[in-house]
Amino acid sequence: RYAGEVMGLSGCGPTALSMVAIFMTGDITKNPRWVADFASQNGYAVDGSGTAWSLMLEGARQIGLSSKEIPVERERVENNLQAGNPIIALMGPGEFTSNGHFIVLTGLQNGRLKINDPNSRKNSEKTWDIDQVLEQTKAVWVYYK
């Protein structure tokens, strides 16, 4: 369980941060369950709401990641992805969610966005129009070495 619900329903935040943590550090012990437990023990899990946004910046720093929030702007997102910096995006209502959902922006392929969606293998296997995704994005956090 996470944030008062089944992890599969409310755990997109810890899962997204786990994906980034393992990619950035190679430490496979920082799996979704580990990040969810960390979030719960440190006040980042909110019953009935999922994950506090602060997990993506403050929580990430506590587990050893360098991160910053950047504006939801195409050029900033593209530049960071081209530099190899993964980005966690908080999605608003649209194609990914009816309320709120965290996904990972992993790169660009032929000018289109590649993502890891903790809730959908199908979404993760295709590429996306970057403007289409950013129109649904509420906030983004970039991770770097």
Label the model's feature ranges.
Residues 108-145:
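Noncatalytic regulatory segments and standalone regulatory/sensor domains
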Residues 61, 66-114:
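Active-site-adjacent substructure of cysteine-protease-like catalytic cores
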Residues 47-49, 54, 96-101, 123-125:
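Extracytoplasmic/secreted cell-surface and envelope-processing proteins
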Residues 13-21, 32, 36, 53, ...:
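Extracytoplasmic/secreted envelope proteins and their assembly/folding machinery
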Residues 30-31, 36-72:
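Mid-length scaffold segments of soluble, non-membrane domains
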Residues 1-6, 103, 128-129:
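Short, polar loop/linker segments at the starts of domains and inter-domain junctions
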Residues 1-44:
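Active-site-adjacent structural segments surrounding the nucleophilic cysteine of cysteine proteases
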